[in-house]
Amino acid sequence: MEIVRDIKTMREKVAEMKRQGKSVGLVPTMGYLHEGHLALIDTARKENDVVVVSDFVNPLQFGPNEDYLVYPRDMDRDAQLCSEHGVDFLFVPTVEEMYPKKGNQVDVFVDVKHLDENLCGRFRPGHFRGVVTVVTKLFNIVSPNRAYFGMKDIQQLRIIEEMVNDLNMNIEIVPVPTVREPSGLALSSRNTYLSAEEREKAASIYKSLLMAKDLILEKGVISTAEVIGTCTRFLSQQGFKVQYFQLVDYDTLELLPKIEPPQKIIIATAVFLGKVRLIDNLVIEVR
């Protein structure tokens, strides 16, 4: 495995691979890799001749009071895991390399409309603008045939799918299912902020999603307000501060006033456990 730190070299390496007729898969990450990231890497490894992992904590997608400065980082461990999982190139640019203007200023962004109005986008203004801008930069640098994103960040995945479609990018976006602990807790780099007791309690997040699924698919509840109310009360009783619990249309990410089959629905929530913000979702099809 080769570690690449600058854009020029990364482009040259990929261009050489493509001249040899090789396909390239990109796994964009913010580092501090866990089994969820490794599932993305392993999927990319099976489907491409060359695998590139980017390891970059992107300041553009953090709000002023969020955890950019303390976001967990362990570059040596990330490099070891990437090497063990057959990664060909680990791209680790600095902030100055990605945003070279004075003060890391960015004057041109890729913007998002409508798709960021609900779920996390409603509570993290500017977040998805930062995400799609850096992903566009990575796509331009690496020119992958395929790029891999986890379904745990479902709004991010859907926005990137639409971006690629709307901007005619010749890249296949490959969704990879959420990886969970045995308790059901979705793997996340931010889980490292949790104590052992909090980690145990956090398993209730997934239980709330399963509860919503059961209410809709098994009990036939058609009122989304009823589903949301039941699940929000459950989470509150478990000690969470619920930022949102929403049911949205898979394609448009618009809030659903009621269940009307056939529908593909994202059941999603964001909660605080102490100061730690955790998200999770489940995708269901109502026939």
Swiss-Prot record:
The record's keywords, sorted A to Z, are: ATP-binding, Cytoplasm, Ligase, Nucleotide-binding, Pantothenate biosynthesis
An example of a Gene Ontology cellular component annotation for this protein is: cytosol
Q: What does the entry list as the binding residues for ATP?
A: 30-37, 150-153, 179, 187-190
Q: Would you kindly state one Gene Ontology biological process term found in this protein's UniProt entry? A: pantothenate biosynthetic process
Which CDD domains does its entry note?
PanC
Q: Tell me which positions the record assigns to the signal sequence.
A: none
Q: Where does (R)-pantoate bind?
A: 61, 156
Pathway assigned to this chain's UniProt record: Cofactor biosynthesis; (R)-pantothenate biosynthesis; (R)-pantothenate from (R)-pantoate and beta-alanine: step 1/1
Q: What catalytic activity is recorded?
A: (R)-pantoate + beta-alanine + ATP = (R)-pantothenate + AMP + diphosphate + H(+)
Which sites are catalytic? Answer: 37 (proton donor)
- EC numbers listed for it are 6.3.2.1
**Oligomeric form and interacting partners:** Homodimer.
In terms of NCBIfam families, this protein maps to: cyt_tran_rel, panC
Spell out the note in the miscellaneous section. Answer: The reaction proceeds by a bi uni uni bi ping pong mechanism.
Q: Which PANTHER family match?
A: CYTIDYLATE KINASE/PANTOATE-BETA-ALANINE LIGASE, PANTOATE--BETA-ALANINE LIGASE
**Role summary:** Catalyzes the condensation of pantoate with beta-alanine in an ATP-dependent reaction via a pantoyl-adenylate intermediate.
What family does this chain come from, according to its entry? Belongs to the pantothenate synthetase family.
Identify this protein by name.
Answer: Pantothenate synthetase
